[in-house]
């Protein structure tokens, strides 16, 4: 006899963590094969996003392992541009992540091209996060607009989410990805090879192109073979070069087919982006505002 599949909680309900806190569920923000995400309030009325993993028809232990892997990675990888996990727990056959509440995904902003200033600022934050992952020997493997969350404020803050298929390199040059969306495949992955730190730069190049132009550089309507052909033939890089813009020129290097001809790190990409007039002028102005403190002259005792 099989155990009944647990039901996802509903808006207006509550979930208690084994650690004690009770989380009150608000509206459902999204759902998918994994489960659902809710607005929620914490025990001190803090605003969180509650991600619920539902076993469904998959083996319980398999879903539990995925949930625990993502939870432990988010808990370990603390960075201002990576979504913060506040709590994670298992209750009544379901698995929960209590996450930092963001306002929306980057995907919801991509109806039109961004200003160059916004492209560079969002790229800066994402490159900062990708560099942090690389420094900690991780490849994200799933960099796209739906996995970038945005916090509104005086300036927009971008945060990477969903480390479920990220891979730890353990000092190796690459790792065989378990799954990668076809439209996100770097040439080395499309050829059946390994994800490397440069593979994340390729995926980020696709995303920066999309922010810069408002369209994705790969035609995803042509099926798997057509998508792979575009990646193999270097179509994304050619499109970036054809833009004839400073941002497009930098993106074209990120999208080179051979890893050794791409940038070597996210920091190296940023070193080129920050030289662009649209950012460097602002940088000079902000630097000029930093106060200079003169040391006090030494005093005589007595």
Positions of predicted regions on the chain:
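Protein kinase glycine-rich loop
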Residues: 26-32, 37
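Protein kinase catalytic-loop region centered on the HRD/HxD motif
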Residues: 128-138
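Activation segment signature within eukaryotic-like protein kinase domains
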Residues: 122-123
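Activation-segment/catalytic-loop signature of the eukaryotic protein kinase fold
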Residues: 88
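Conserved short submotifs of the Hanks-type protein kinase catalytic core
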Residues: 92-105
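Conserved beta3-strand ATP-binding lysine motif
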Residues: 51-56
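AlphaC helix of the eukaryotic protein kinase fold
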Residues: 57-76
């Amino acid at each position: 006899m099989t155990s009944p599949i647990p039901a996802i909680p509903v808006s207006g309900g509550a979930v208690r963590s084994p650690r004690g806190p009770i989380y009150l569920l608000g509206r459902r923000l999204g759902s998918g094969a994994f489960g659902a995400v809710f607005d929620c309030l914490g025990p001190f009325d803090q605003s969180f996003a509650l991600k619920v993993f539902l076993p469904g028809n998959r083996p319980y232990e398999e879903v539990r392992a995925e949930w625990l892997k993502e939870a432990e990675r988010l808990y370990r990888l603390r960075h201002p541009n990576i979504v913060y996990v506040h709590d994670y727990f298992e209750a009544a056959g379901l698995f929960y992540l209590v996450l930092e509440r963001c306002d929306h995904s980057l995907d919801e902003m991509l109806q039109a091209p961004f200003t160059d200033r916004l492209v560079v600022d969002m790229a800066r934050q994402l490159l900062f996060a990708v560099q942090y992952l690389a420094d900690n020997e991780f490849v994200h493997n799933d960099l796209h607009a739906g996995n970038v969350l945005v916090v509104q404020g005086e300036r927009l803050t971008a945060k990477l989410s969903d480390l479920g298929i990220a891979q730890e390199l353990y000092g190796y040059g690459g790792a065989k990805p378990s799954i990668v969306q076809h439209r996100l495949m770097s040439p080395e992955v499309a050829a059946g090879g390994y994800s490397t730190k440069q593979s994340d730069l390729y995926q980020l190049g696709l995303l920066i192109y999309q922010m810069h132009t408002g369209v994705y550089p790969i035609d995803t309507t042509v099926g798997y073979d057509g998508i792979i052909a575009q990646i193999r033939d270097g179509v994304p890089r050619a499109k970036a070069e054809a833009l004839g813009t400073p941002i497009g020129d930098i993106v074209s290097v990120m999208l080179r087919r051979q890893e050794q001809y791409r940038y070597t790190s996210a920091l190296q990409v940023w070193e080129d982006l920050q030289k662009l007039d649209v950012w460097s002028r602002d940088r000079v102005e902000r630097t000029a505002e930093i106060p200079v403190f003169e040391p006090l002259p030494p005093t005589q005792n007595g």
